[in-house]
Amino acid sequence: MYGIEYTTILIFLISIILLNYILKSVTRIMDYIIYRFLLITIALFALTRAQNYGLNLPITGSMDTVYTNSTQEEVFLTSTLCLYYPNEASTQINDGDWKDSLSQMFLTKGWPTGSVYFKEYSSIVDFSVDPQLYCDYNLVLMKYDQSLELDMSELADLILNEWLCNPMDITLYYYQQSGESNKWISMGSSCTVKVCPLNTQTLGIGCQTTNVDSFEMVAENEKLAIVDVVDGINHKINLTTTTCTIRNCKKLGPRENVAVIQVGGSNVLDITADPTTNPQTERMMRVNWKKWWQVFYTIVDYINQIVQVMSKRSRSLNSAAFYYRV
């Protein structure tokens, strides 16, 4: 009789111990699942709130200035549209209320008053140094000038694409370009860039590394120069550092909230450096009118079709057409 009672008590104790072990195991498993879920949630939240490119730094100004980087799509009551145009447009129109008139016309196309901004620039070369593209959608009007074809092409290549750039210390290092998307971009009040290609013994190819006058000039007295050299070859670079900066840049892809409208000219400018690629891009357009009123009327008429080939901005743009990302 006592043996049966002892056995019952023993089974009861073993059951309690086993149940306690099971409960602890379940608790540990639940803790693991909960912690993993929280970790994944936090990681996904971080990825959706910030991009993984690092800090965004402007092409002009101090490299110590940090700008907010974000891929979050802010909720706007309305999209903003910026029109950039040469000052000759307002001079030719000669009407103090012309912007208000155009705003009323944009209203008929679904753009509320106050959502369209008109920004004037003095010249293509000056605009190329500090484009300042502020809006969700940015339309840059460039009047065709045969003498400025290369400047227009370089500016279009600059603002229609997104670039990943790093500073270059040309006094200490040689540099080489790794591929077609790799370019050196120099900007300033006056940029003269000379290069000396080097062989495997770091001796100049057709130039003397100790004689700057023997270097090959690839840009002279320009405000914006996108320099392309032979890939895979080290180069010694000479630059007017007092009036110009140079960066080692890689083209990441299109900046789809920017479009260029060429006013005049027989064909849309080719902005590609590679002669084997198709130069056409949907965001490089042309209108062929002599009067600026007609140009703006055409833009108002086709604004929604133009915007359809663009994408709303995913990050704030300030101080320059693109960011250096380090």
From Swiss-Prot:
Family according to the record: Belongs to the rotavirus VP7 family.
Binding site for Ca(2+) 2: Q177, D228, V229, D231, D301
Range of residues in the leader sequence: 1-50
Binding sites annotated in the UniProt record for Ca(2+) 1: D95, G206, S214, E216
SS bonds (residue pairs): C82-C135, C165-C249, C191-C244, C196-C207
Name of the protein: Outer capsid glycoprotein VP7
Post-translational modification summary for this protein: N-glycosylated. The N-terminus is blocked possibly by pyroglutamic acid.
Gene3D superfamilies for this protein: Glycoprotein VP7, domain 1, Rotavirus outer-layer protein VP7, domain 2
Entry-listed glycosylation sites: N69, N238
Taxonomy of the source species: Viruses, Riboviria, Orthornavirae, Duplornaviricota, Resentoviricetes
Organism: Rotavirus A (strain RVA/Human/Japan/K8/1977/G1P3A[9])
Region described as GPR motif: spans on this chain: 253-255
